[in-house]
Amino acid sequence: MNINDPKQVQLCIDESQDCEAPFHQPGSPSGYHHFSSKKLKTCPNMIARILGDNPDIRMTTFESRCPVNTSKIALVVDPKEDYHFLRQDSNMLWSQKAGARPVKNVDAAGHTIWDPQLSYLNYSSEDSTLNYSIFCAYLCVPRIKKLYLLPGGGKA
């Protein structure tokens, strides 16, 4: 299986009872089942998974500042395919990293990301079918807390 091919990974998860995702997925450490291509990814489900795995994460707003030693991230979803995070950088602009690709500070239209909620995140015109059409939330995540994961997503 090519772990860099999301469709192969999802096929493995959907069709095999004992197939473990080769990378951490939100909800694995807190006991949620693997994602299924038969069920849409929703904001409430994704947020529950994230907060279940990381109780120190806090919901926030675009205007609010995160506490010291935390970073602000934004969660967006493509309900049929994927979820995605963007991070607010020290210059107050936003950056994103898709899988093994380099970090970018522009959206799918090549525009600087000032606010993820207003950004164009439809990548279906590239070599992908991803369209992060639903904005879910802004979150403050700890920067200094280390999280150790076991194979299969469990916490050490």
Regions found by a protein language model. Give the residues of each.
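Cysteine-nucleophile protease catalytic domains, especially the papain-like/related folds used
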Residues: 1-57
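Low-complexity, intrinsically disordered Gly/Pro/Thr-rich segments
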Residues: 110-128
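Catalytic Cys-His active-site segments of thiol-dependent hydrolases/isopeptidases
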Residues: 83-109, 116
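Extended terminal accessory/targeting regions
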Residues: 28, 89, 96, 151-155
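Residues in well-ordered beta-strands of folded domains
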Residues: 75, 95, 139
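Short, flexible beta-strand-to-coil junctions
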Residues: 76-81, 89, 142-144
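Noncatalytic regulatory segments and standalone regulatory/sensor domains
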Residues: 122-156
